[in-house]
Regions:
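Intrinsically disordered, low-complexity, charged/polar segments
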Residues: 34-62, 112-128
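Intrinsically disordered, low-complexity regulatory segments enriched in Ser/Thr/Pro
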Residues: 83-116
Length: 139
């Protein structure tokens, strides 16, 4: 399920969703400053990847972290007042976020979720009151 400001692919190009309806998704073409409607089934999710995380300020801290008998790559994002840890599963070549830990005011809030796509990560950040980070991802 998509939400406003989620970033998706349309014809291989990243687009930001600016309105939603049952039949159409209106997306904003950032470089051309024009709006157009597209069928929702023409929209594809963007997979979370290591290059995407690094482009958006996340740093690979440990290549392999083990918990629950699975192996993960640990990425960290640091900013004034908070830190984010993402643990990316490397099981069966399936790259997904298995654990999201957000530290605010020295308190860590852990969310165990399976996130495969950028829009899912954006929505998780919004639920944790990190709207500005979610809405400013670089693709």
């Amino acid at each position: 399920m998509y939400a406003l400001n989620d970033i998706v692919l349309y014809k291989g190009e990243p687009k930001r969703i600016v309105s939603l309806s049952n039949e159409y998704v209106e997306t904003y073409i950032k470089l051309e400053d024009i709006y157009f409607n597209i069928l929702q089934n023409g929209v594809e999710p963007i997979e979370i990847s290591k290059p995407f995380l690094m482009k958006n300020g996340f740093v690979l801290k440990k290549l392999l972290v083990t918990f629950d008998e699975d192996k993960f790559a640990k990425f960290v994002y640091l900013n004034d007042g908070f830190a984010i840890e993402l643990y990316i599963s490397e099981k069966d070549d399936d790259l997904n976020v298995a654990r999201l830990v957000i530290h605010k005011n020295n308190v860590g809030n852990m969310i165990d979720v399976k996130l495969n796509y950028v829009h899912e990560l954006q929505q998780a950040f919004r639920m944790c009151n990190l709207q500005y980070l979610a809405d400013n991802f670089k693709i």
